[in-house]
């Protein structure tokens, strides 16, 4: 009998988007009889552990980045480039021990540029091949291209045609041959659709701070004005995840499982 392959799936912990789009990939790996090891940090790890409680998981420390509250983003991140490269180097070095300890056969890394290996199939998931900056675009694109080239393949969760989701972020220039457009990734299971017509409005948040909190405050004010049944999913994973009534019509909750969120969407 052929030995089951063990695949490390490791999303970035900047909001929950990277973790949630790994859910359909993990499901497909399990369907193909692979062992899956989840490697992440913070809320991304907590969320995937709740989605897949039977899977093994490990903490792979993430680069802690908090966006400035107002302007100066280019300078802010330019000053942190040495720190970014140092983190990528440390991440790459830590992968050797993970591969040895858990007998890893392949790696799927969502925007974690240090998680590649010379002798193991390594895939990077990203839709940011051509990061938009007000200046130094060529330099930034060159850096991203070099980082992407370390992986055997780069999967873009979008379509290749002009009618796409990510726009210039993944369609703005010459695309390396290792890039594969795999189509949008959804954690929703078509078989679990159930109608839930109770609420009229649904807002789903995710992303790095302080922007997530700032947008949450704006959305709460706007949803109050609607005066209809509404639910705000904050995109925050915590032990206490009870729904909170902000008004008679507006309910707020930290996060929802894929199935419960699908009920609200439908």
PLM regions with names:
Residues 11-23, 210-213:
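A short, glycine/small-residue-rich beta-strand->loop->alpha-helix junction that serves as a flexible
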Residues 19-29, 43-44:
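Short amphipathic alpha-helix
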Residues 26, 169-171, 183-266:
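Donor-nucleotide binding loops and adjacent catalytic segments primarily
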Residues 36-42, 153-159, 230-235:
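Short internal beta-strands
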């Amino acid at each position: 009998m052929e030995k089951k392959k063990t695949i490390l799936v490791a999303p970035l912990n900047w909001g929950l988007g990277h973790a949630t789009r790994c859910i359909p990939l993990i499901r497909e790996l399990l369907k193909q009889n692979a062992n899956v090891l989840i490697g992440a940090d913070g809320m991304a790890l907590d969320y995937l552990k709740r989605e897949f409680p039977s899977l093994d998981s490990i903490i792979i420390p993430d680069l802690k980045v908090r966006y400035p509250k107002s302007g100066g983003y280019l300078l802010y991140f330019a000053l942190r480039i040495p720190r970014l490269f140092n983190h990528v180097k440390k991440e790459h070095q830590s992968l050797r021990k993970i591969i040895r300890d858990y007998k890893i056969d392949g790696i799927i890394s969502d925007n974690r540029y240090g998680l590649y290996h010379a002798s193991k199939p390594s895939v990077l998931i990203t839709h940011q091949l051509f990061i938009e900056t007000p200046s130094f675009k060529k330099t930034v694109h060159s850096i991203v291209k070099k980082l992407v080239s370390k992986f055997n393949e780069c999967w873009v969760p979008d379509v290749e045609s002009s009618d796409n989701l990510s726009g210039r972020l993944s369609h703005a220039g010459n695309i390396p041959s290792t890039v594969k457009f795999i189509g949008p990734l959804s954690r929703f299971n078509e078989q679990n659709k159930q109608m839930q017509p109770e609420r009229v409005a649904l807002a789903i948040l995710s992303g790095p701070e302080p922007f997530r909190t700032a947008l949450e405050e704006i959305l709460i004010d706007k949803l109050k004005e609607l005066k209809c049944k509404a639910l705000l999913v904050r995109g925050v994973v915590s032990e206490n995840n009870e729904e909170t009534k902000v008004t008679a019509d507006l309910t707020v909750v930290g996060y929802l499982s894929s199935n419960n969120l699908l009920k609200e969407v439908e």
